A protein has these predicted regions:
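Residues embedded in well-ordered secondary-structure elements
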Residues: 1, 52-54
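A generic structural signal for short beta-strands and their flanking turns/coil linkers
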Residues: 34-38, 45-49, 57-61
Length: 128
């Protein structure tokens, strides 16, 4: 199991294609994950993106877009290990805090997209 393991999901009332258009912008990746070096491993279009991760972490990350009813569930996964940390030093790290910070980064991404795509939409109304 990875030391950093995040699995999260958020519903966005918008079509997967619209969500994918927001997720696929590399400039946004630097805002959402400024310290990570992301290399696209697989661009899945309206199904999301898979990356390899380098920098302070080494591993994989994915945003999977699942069509659900009148919107999209944005699944965010990160599986990684701290870089340049010995097994002995790993035990002294605040892994819970590191996982929490990475989960918050994922929520920042999904809520930014949600806010943009659901702007002006009344609760219970269909997506635009």
């Amino acid at each position: 199991m990875s030391s950093i393991q995040v699995a999260d999901q958020t519903f966005v009332a918008a079509a997967p294609e619209k969500v994918a258009a927001r997720v696929s912008v590399p400039a946004r990746w630097r805002a959402w994950w400024p310290d990570l070096v992301l290399d696209v491993r697989e661009d899945r279009a309206e199904k999301g993106v898979r990356w390899t991760v380098a920098g302070p972490l080494t591993g994989t990350m994915e945003v999977w877009l699942e069509p659900v009813m009148d919107g999209t569930v944005v699944h965010y996964f990160l599986h990684a290990e701290p870089t340049r940390v010995s097994p002995q030093a790993l035990a002294s790290l605040d892994l819970a805090g590191m996982n929490h910070a990475r989960r918050l980064a994922g929520k920042t991404m999904t809520f930014e997209i949600k806010q943009q795509l659901e702007a002006g939409r009344a609760a219970g109304e269909p997506p635009a």
